[in-house]
Curated annotation (Swiss-Prot):
The record marks 228 as: Plays an important role in substrate specificity. It comes from Haemophilus influenzae (strain ATCC 51907 / DSM 11121 / KW20 / Rd). GO terms for cellular component: cytoplasm; cytosol. Its EC number is 2.1.2.1. The modification N6-(pyridoxal phosphate)lysine is found at residue 229. One of its GO terms (biological process) is glycine biosynthetic process from serine. PANTHER family: SERINE HYDROXYMETHYLTRANSFERASE. Its main location: cytoplasm. This is Serine hydroxymethyltransferase. SUPFAM superfamilies: PLP-dependent transferases. Gene3D superfamilies: Aspartate Aminotransferase, domain 1, Type I PLP-dependent aspartate aminotransferase-like (Major domain). It catalyses: (6R)-5,10-methylene-5,6,7,8-tetrahydrofolate + glycine + H2O = (6S)-5,6,7,8-tetrahydrofolate + L-serine. Keywords: Amino-acid biosynthesis, Cytoplasm, One-carbon metabolism, Pyridoxal phosphate, Transferase.
Length: 421
């Protein structure tokens, strides 16, 4: 029998301690991983609701189990809000993750062995855009395009490769690209070779929802996103389309269920609905505008301190810092900043001489720090601290600088908590 006052603390102290330690880590560290954000207490409340108990195979009004009347309300609410948010005609809120959403799109539109053309992981793409270690590079014949020496997508390279390999599907989108993608140009190339255009907007979905980054829906056949990055919701996936082709919509439905997934996670869909409601509110646009302002402010500091920023700037929530000129590695920078309670991720940069697990750069993103209240002055100061640590790498004062920086980080984290009590 269950009781409402059951807790993890008195039942599983080892697990409870790990949860408490993670809570403290998040409060005392500055989070700059571009793919991470803080979910609101309302989102977490929905994730912990009784919907976690409900099996609901199928879709609203067409379930394989009884007792789904309230699950239907939740899912339809999430669908309708996502349609309004992005201007979509078709929405599927069931994918458990962005990768599963992408797998469903491939399964709906093309067959095993067909050719796809996507951005090279080393140039800012994603594993699921055709990387050889991913299902997308194993099941399908993947051809990769990249960026120029200036850090910009080479659309002529995309076009030439499309003409050469005649892909059935072109993937646009990224995990580490700081500029604006020309969705219309990508569709023009896709139409020229008779390919589908599939856009993965996971990293910039929040900016798109706020009207601060071009919406790919008018140009793409199908669009996917995660719901936890700039959107700031639960960890999950989403498929959208406005192509007007009912056959594609039907294929997408069946490719999610039953082809790739069984029962949807109704508690996560409820959390997605909460997230979409928040994204429709006026203050959401202000938040996303501040995300971009903060990223631009940090870029200027890094450049002033002599560090190269890939593509020389940013038009979204992230940017890459290259250490090739300094002879540093992303791995060393990641570790040193981590000791100072600043969390980033090492990242490959164009013409990177280092191995993928070492790299010559870091990726920096501002959704999380902006969510906890950092303004432009705060992030300029933060970028300066980061440069102090990077400047000291390998020098006698390295540990001293790291210790001093950590004290500054703890102070600002105390002033700007993630979840104020």
């Amino acid at each position: 029998m269950f009781t409402r006052n059951m807790t993890i603390a008195d039942y599983d102290p080892v697990l409870w301690q790990a949860i408490q330690d993670e809570n403290r880590r998040q409060e005392e560290h500055i989070e700059l991983i571009a793919s991470e954000n803080y979910a609101s207490p309302r989102v977490m409340e929905a994730q912990g609701s009784q919907f976690t108990n409900k099996y609901a195979e199928g879709y609203p009004g067409k379930r394989y189990y009884g007792g789904c009347e309230y699950a239907d309300i939740v899912e339809q609410l999430a669908i309708d809000r996502a349609k309004e948010l992005f201007g979509a005609d078709y929405v599927n809120v069931q994918p458990h993750s962005g990768s599963q959403a992408n797998a469903a799109v491939y399964g709906a539109l093309i067959n095993a062995g067909d050719t796809i053309l996507g951005m090279d992981l080393a140039h800012g793409g994603h594993l699921t855009h055709g990387a050889k270690v991913s299902f997308s590079g194993k099941i399908y014949n993947s051809v990769l395009y990249g960026i120029t020496a200036d850090g910009l997508i080479d659309y002529e390279d995309v076009r030439q490769k499309a003409l050469e390999c005649k892909p059935k599907l072109i993937v646009a989108g990224f995990s580490a690209y700081s500029q604006v993608v020309d969705w219309a140009k990508m569709r023009e190339i896709a139409d020229e070779v008779g390919a589908y255009l599939f856009v993965d907007m996971a990293h910039v979905a929040g900016l798109i929802a706020a009207g601060l980054y071009p919406n790919p829906l008018p140009h793409a056949h199908v669009v996917t996103t995660t719901t936890h990055k700039t959107l700031g919701g639960p960890r999950g996936g989403l498929i959208l389309s406005s192509c007007g082709d009912e056959e594609i919509y039907k294929k997408l439905q069946s490719s999610v269920f039953p082809a790739n997934q069984g029962g949807p996670l109704v508690h996560i869909i409820a959390a997605k609905a909460v997230c979409f409601k928040g994204a429709l509110e006026p203050q959401y646009k202000e938040y996303q505008a501040n995300v971009i302002k903060n990223a631009k402010a940090m870029v200027e500091v890094f450049k002033q301190r002599g560090y190269d920023v890939v593509s020389n700037g940013t038009e979204n929530h992230l940017f890459l810092v290259s250490f090739i000129k300094q002879g540093l590695t992303g791995k060393a920078a990641d570790a040193a900043l981590g000791k100072a309670n600043i969390t980033v991720n090492k990242n490959a940069v164009p013409n990177d001489p280092q191995k993928p697990f070492v790299t010559s750069g870091i990726r920096v993103g501002t959704p999380s720090v902006t969510r906890r209240g950092f303004n432009e002055n705060d992030v300029r100061e933060l970028a300066g601290w980061m440069c102090d640590v990077l400047d000291a790498l390998g020098k006698e004062n390295e540990e001293q600088v790291i210790a001093e920086t950590k004290e500054k980080v703890l102070a600002i984290c105390k002033r700007l908590p993630v979840y104020p009590k």
